[in-house]
Amino acid sequence: MKISNLLGVLVVFLAVVKGQKKDEGSDDSELLALVTVPDGPVIFSIEQVEQVAAPSTDKHLSKLKPKIAYDKVEPFEMAQPSESTITEKAAIKFRPKLYIANGCHAYPAVNKAGQISKGMKTADPTFATCGKPSKGTQVYGRSAWFGTVWAIMYAWYFPDIPLDWEYAIVWTNNPNVSNPVILGVTVSNSEGSTTSQTPPDPAMVDGRSVKIAYNNKGLESSTTLGGTQNLVMWHQLTVEAQEALNKKASFNGVQVPMNDNHFLRNLEASWPFSKEYLQ
């Protein structure tokens, strides 16, 4: 089933009010109408999903090395809830709690200048050298309507050998209601596919955070409580960071789940509901 044929799909773009795109963070009052359940089908492409990037601050980017050591990558700061829009607040609210059962901890993959992580030089069976990152953790987010469900993707980068990207999708009813709820959760597993729970097992949820474990290069729903990481949404990344994450060669061909090439495809491939949620 092609994405272009899905019914009821709504993405966050601000052409509705004034006929032109604006930064999502410009005004919550304009955003309100854009995060309610859609009335009918909307045909869209990746160009209509949140595309605004944060401005770069480095004037000497061309002189920088494209790749740096995995433990030298500075993470993006997480916007405080009071400074965030409705969709950003929802992404912060539903951040999964990740427990590292076996493997490296989640590290920043790219910095503001677009320099990406090289990953580890040699494998460490004990994972001691890729434990908790000294410069801070990072989880990457991106969200959109898919059918009548608000999908929030969270993606983590692990600098092990080989490099690894994993993701979780938290499917919610609506970010713009007083009490949004989790309808389901999908995680990428160690077999290269996905596993879903609809709804998630209550024992695997802590408040509004699903509990997830990283184990043997894959994610799985868990009863063990982990921690949260600094969240940066796709549209909060600099242009340089977005471009680096969009390049297929950046991570030796390993898929970056939330980039322009894979975000919508992963939502479609991970869809865990019946057709009623598409109408």
Curated annotation (Swiss-Prot):
Indicate the principal place this protein occupies in or around the cell.
Answer: secreted
Q: What induces it?
A: Expressed strongly at the early stages of host infection (up to 24 hours after infection) but subsided quickly afterward.
| Sites where a glycan is attached | N176
Q: Does the keyword Ribosomal protein apply?
A: no
Quote a single Gene Ontology cellular component term: extracellular region
Function summary: Secreted effector that acts as a pathogen-associated molecular pattern (PAMP) recognized by the plant immune system. Seems not to induce necrosis in Nicotiana benthamiana leaves.
What's the protein here called? NLP effector protein 9
Task: Provide the species name.
Answer: Plasmopara viticola
- What is the taxonomic lineage of the source species? Eukaryota, Sar, Stramenopiles, Oomycota, Peronosporales
